[in-house]
């Protein structure tokens, strides 16, 4: 019915109160002896660390008005996993012109359909990342388009968005 993953997503997300108690908006772990370990825990490849260091610069310069990246770092710092259901359980209406952060018009394919959860739940036998899911998730989120977009400075992206609107 679901799997565990090292990867994170806040689209259609939910959490437990005990996990949220660890939320570290200030990211107090930075410049500590744990920083490299936490960064390494964000992904599986060296390029992932480079990407997440870039996200830190965006946060430091207040280019993003979001909390989700800090949440991702919190999960990494606490070595917590995410749970992904077999099927999307929500219809995400947070895309498009009225959206706060995701103003792109193209809604990702995994939000097109949703299903109700099926009972009884089929639980994974172990609480470890499910590698098959993680490979697919990584490939989907690291397509050529997304990879190129990462290297375009945020100011330019914001300028282009304003022109398009």
Task: Put a short name on every predicted segment.
Residues 1-165:
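An acidic/histidine-cluster motif and surrounding catalytic segment
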């Amino acid at each position: 019915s679901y799997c565990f993953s090292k990867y994170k997503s806040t689209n259609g997300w939910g959490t437990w109160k005990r996990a949220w108690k660890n939320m570290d908006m200030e990211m107090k772990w930075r410049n500590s002896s744990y920083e490299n370990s936490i960064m390494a825990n964000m992904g599986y490849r060296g390029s992932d660390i480079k990407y997440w260091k870039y996200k830190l610069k965006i946060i430091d310069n207040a280019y993003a008005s979001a909390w989700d990246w800090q949440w991702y770092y919190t999960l990494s710092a606490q070595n917590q996993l995410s749970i992904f259901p077999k099927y999307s359980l929500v219809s995400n209406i947070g895309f498009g012109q009225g959206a706060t952060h995701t103003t792109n018009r193209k809604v990702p394919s995994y939000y097109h359909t949703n299903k109700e959860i099926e009972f009884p739940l089929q639980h994974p036998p172990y609480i470890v990342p499910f590698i098959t899911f993680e490979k697919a998730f990584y490939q989907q989120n690291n397509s050529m388009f997304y990879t190129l977009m990462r290297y375009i400075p945020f100011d330019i992206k914001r300028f282009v968005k304003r022109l398009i609107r």
